[in-house]
């Protein structure tokens, strides 16, 4: 998949340590879970001839938001984001689909391996099933958001999943092989860091290319670029900051984070309504 190749090519410039993946298998999810993990309800969703786990937090009957993982998997940071989303305004029901089927990376090499092996078309089907589950279980409207790999999938869902009512994507764009953003059906808001070095995937050039495609689509859209910010700038927990620094990403900008969340809130409130 071209989206994965773009991200992997840029990630090859990051510092790597040999991962235990290649000798002893993945670490269990608990190794990455925060204390907040207990707030989630674990549910199994069936699509076609397979099932997958999702993690749900927030008020029943509230508008829903499907929250898509970074290339690490369903770790503490995507759970932090989902909890935050569930508490915005009058509240949302946030749902994280486990696209990696229980695997979580602890090192960049693991994340590369997992993302390279992702069935991207299958992930789109997981997203569609997640959106449908929320709508069938009390959410009148459902949006999709995602980060890095999940950001690319979020944009793709706005093209390929007709049940999606709104999208907010963070630092990720899909390849034309996965989804042509000029054919978007849902309103899309996207956020990028000015200093993002993931060329062709999340850098300024990719952001501007996405904006041109969204203009051509005719859907409501916004593309925001944050000065002085690099990749994954929304990740602000102590654990995430340590991990970012290990990847050479040393910027911290709480003002940009607050502004992005404010824009997220306004966008989802506009298209999903309030609980």
PLM regions and their residue ranges:
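N-terminal chloroplast transit peptides
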Residues: 1-19
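Serine-hydrolase catalytic machinery in alpha/beta-hydrolase-like enzymes
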Residues: 2, 27-138, 236-250
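Short alpha-helix in the alpha/beta-hydrolase fold that links the catalytic acid
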Residues: 80-81, 200-212
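Primarily recognizes the serine-hydrolase "nucleophile elbow" in alpha/beta-hydrolase
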Residues: 128-185
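Short, proline-enriched alpha-helix->beta-strand connector loops that line the catalytic pocket
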Residues: 183-188, 218-220
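Short beta-strand/loop motif that positions the catalytic acidic residue
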Residues: 184, 190-192, 226
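Acidic catalytic loop of the alpha/beta-hydrolase fold
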Residues: 195-205, 231-232
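C-terminal catalytic histidine-bearing segment of alpha/beta-hydrolase fold enzymes
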Residues: 215-275
């Amino acid at each position: 998949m071209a989206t994965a190749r773009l991200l992997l090519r840029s990630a090859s410039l990051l510092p790597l340590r040999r991962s235990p993946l290649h000798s002893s298998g993945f670490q269990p999810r608990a190794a990455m879970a925060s204390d907040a993990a207990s707030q989630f309800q674990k549910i199994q969703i069936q699509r076609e001839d397979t099932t997958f786990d999702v993690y749900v937090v927030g008020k029943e009957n509230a508008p829903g938001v499907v929250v898509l993982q970074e290339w690490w998997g369903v770790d503490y940071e995507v759970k932090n984001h989902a909890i935050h989303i569930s508490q915005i305004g009058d509240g949302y029901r946030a749902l994280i689909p486990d696209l990696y089927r229980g695997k979580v990376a602890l090192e960049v090499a693991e994340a590369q391996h997992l993302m390279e092996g992702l069935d991207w078309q299958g992930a789109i089907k997981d997203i569609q099933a997640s959106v449908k589950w929320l709508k069938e279980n009390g959410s009148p409207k459902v949006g999709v958001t995602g980060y890095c790999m999940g950001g690319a999938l979020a944009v793709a869902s706005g093209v390929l999943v007709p049940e999606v009512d709104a999208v907010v994507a963070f630092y990720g764009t899909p390849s034309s092989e996965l989804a042509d953003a000029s054919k978007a059906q849902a309103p899309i808001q996207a956020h990028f860091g000015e200093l993002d070095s993931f060329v062709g995937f999340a850098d300024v050039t990719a952001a501007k290319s996405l904006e041109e495609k969204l203009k051509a689509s005719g859907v409501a859209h916004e593309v925001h670029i944050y000065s002085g910010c690099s990749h994954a700038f929304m990740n602000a927990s102590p654990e995430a900051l340590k991990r970012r620094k290990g990847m050479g990403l040393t910027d911290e900008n709480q003002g940009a984070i607050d502004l992005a969340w404010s824009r997220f809130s306004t966008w989802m409130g506009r298209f999903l309504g309030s609980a």
